[in-house]
A protein has these predicted regions:
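Structural alpha-helical scaffold elements that stabilize or flank donor/cofactor-binding regions
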Residues: 2, 101-102, 161-162
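Histidine-anchored nucleotide/phosphate-binding helix
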Residues: 24-33, 128-130
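Single conserved hydrophobic/aromatic residue that forms the stacking wall/gate
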Residues: 1-6, 10
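Conserved beta-alpha-beta core of the PfkB/ribokinase-like small-molecule kinase fold
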Residues: 108-190, 197, 206-208
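A short, glycine/small-residue-rich beta-strand->loop->alpha-helix junction that serves as a flexible
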Residues: 14-23
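Conserved phosphate-binding/catalytic region of the ribokinase-like
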Residues: 181-302
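Conserved N-terminal subdomain of the carbohydrate kinase-like
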Residues: 36-116, 134, 138, 300-302
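Alpha-helix C-terminal capping segments
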Residues: 19, 28-37, 245-247
């Protein structure tokens, strides 16, 4: 997993709290909690915020790539939580990434969010995506943050540059409405499929999930009932579930690229229904706190 990392600062009427975060970092944690061996390339400092990030990575059994802890300062993201649990963000960051060596055992490389569209790190991300495509499935979640992007038109160019390099793309309806104001979600998804991915998945909050493949499959999945505490990390947990589900279905890895493109409706529906459950568990508790297999009532993997 290729990631920016941050200390998330949560502000409500209650006292301010700090937790480790960053979208692909959350995905890595979610995958690890689902029993997958996960490696993270990121950037943070040996400071108070960085130690929070390191402890979180190590406590979840994630392998940290060398040089990930050599930043001058650790980025922070301040999440302001509304009464309905929706989060808005303010960021304080400057960052780059260490070089990632992709081993022959790598099955999937995931990246997204700030890492993929903020200079200078975005150039490293694109390089990793290009190199990874030769031996692994490449997945991407733009996780749009309008406060850090100039305007939809320039943001589309940056994000579609990564979309074209990916096999699987996940985005929220809010992402797409900001990037393509006034356009239909399915129309946007088909445009992205034309750029190269085999699968595009769109999360729509309480309205459910849309999924389209470049072979013409189109699915709508209902959301899973949940009592929302806050929405922080919900999309990242969903992404972890999507990767885990595709992994279990033997649809990840360069040797399975054709199988991924030809995924059948029943398999994709099963995977996305479980993803909805994973997202529902995450929004039912505070912070980016993805579920374990035990939370899902599933047996641990050997």
């Amino acid at each position: 997993v290729r990631s920016s990392a941050a200390a998330d600062v949560y502000e409500r009427q209650a006292p301010t709290t700090e937790h480790p975060g960053g979208s692909p970092l959350n995905v890595a944690v979610g995958l690890a909690r689902l029993g997958r061996r996960t490696q993270l390339a990121t950037r943070f400092a040996d400071d108070d915020h960085g130690r929070i990030v390191r402890d979180h990575i190590e406590s979840n059994g994630i392998q940290l790539c060398p040089c990930s802890d050599e930043a001058l300062t650790t980025a922070t993201a301040t999440a302001r939580l509304a009464s309905d649990g929706q989060a808005s963000y303010h960021f304080d960051l400057t960052w780059d990434l260490p070089r990632l060596d992709i081993s022959d055992e790598t099955i999937v490389v995931h990246t997204g969010s700030i890492a993929s569209w903020t200079a200078p790190g975005r150039d490293h991300v694109r390089d990793v995506m290009d190199r990874a495509k030769e031996q692994a499935t490449v997945t991407y979640d733009p996780n749009v943050r309008p406060d850090l992007l100039d305007d939809p038109e320039s943001a589309r160019l940056l994000i579609e540059n990564c979309v074209s390099r990916a096999d699987v793309v996940k985005a929220s309806d809010e992402d797409l409405h900001w990037l393509h104001p006034g356009d239909d979600l399915r129309t946007i998804a088909r445009h992205w499929l034309d750029l190269g991915p085999s699968l595009v998945v769109i999360t729509c909050g309480g309205s459910g999930i849309l999924a389209l493949t470049d072979r013409g499959l189109s699915l709508s999945i209902p959301s899973h009932p949940a009592k929302v505490v806050d929405t922080v990390g919900a999309g990242d947990s969903f992404m972890s579930g999507l990767l885990d589900g595709l992994w279990s279905a033997e649809l990840l890895g360069v040797e399975h690229r054709d199988d991924l493109a030809a995924v059948d409706e029943a398999t994709l529906r099963r995977i996305l229904t479980r993803c909805a459950h994973i997202g529902a568990i995450t929004v039912s508790r505070a912070g980016a706190n993805p579920p374990t297999l035990a939370d899902l009532g599933e047996d641990a993997r050997n």
